[in-house]
Amino acid sequence: FNPALYKLTATLNSGKQSEKKQVQFGMRDFKIEGKWFYVNGRKTMLRGTVENCDFPLTGYAPMDVASWERVFRICRNYGLNHMRFHSFCPPEAAFIAADLVGFYLQPEGPSWPNHGPRLGNGQPIDKYLMDETIALTKEYGNYASYCMLACGNEPSGRWVAWVSKFVDYWKATDPRRVYTGASVGNSWQWQPHNEYHVKAGARGL
């Protein structure tokens, strides 16, 4: 997308004390109608890639805006317009850079809950993923590039009921983006509360 960014400055004065807060943000409408994504009423085809949190030289994701700007500009040069973050949420620098470049993001809750922990069985992972996605949305929810959310990757357990509640919670709580229960591989079943579906091997779907 072609970003138009705004800065809001709020100042609180109380006697001799003064506090100022400035926030940069964008305004956009991101929704689904039928089988299509629409951005500000315009039918939009998403062409994306996945970031697997693989940063072997540092062991962690870049924390500076310039590094993420470089990544997103390279992606745009190849005709891509969105990125899924596999089982993690990138640092704030990624959202800032995506807003500057014009790139759609899908962060996820930090879990791949089929290697021990399982969703919907009353394990700590259930509350943990809700707490984490609430926290990341509270922190980064005003960034226009934050358009999609999943609880994590390829769940197991009684996951269909759990991710259905997850999607229902977010649709009712924050309509600024669209939601899917979890990003899944080739053989996971459809979860009917999803607003969209993330699936590997999309060609021939």
Locate each region found by the language model.
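Secreted/periplasmic carbohydrate-active enzymes, especially glycoside hydrolases
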Residues: 1-86, 97, 101-102, 132, ...
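Substrate-binding/catalytic cleft of secreted carbohydrate-active enzymes
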Residues: 73, 82-205
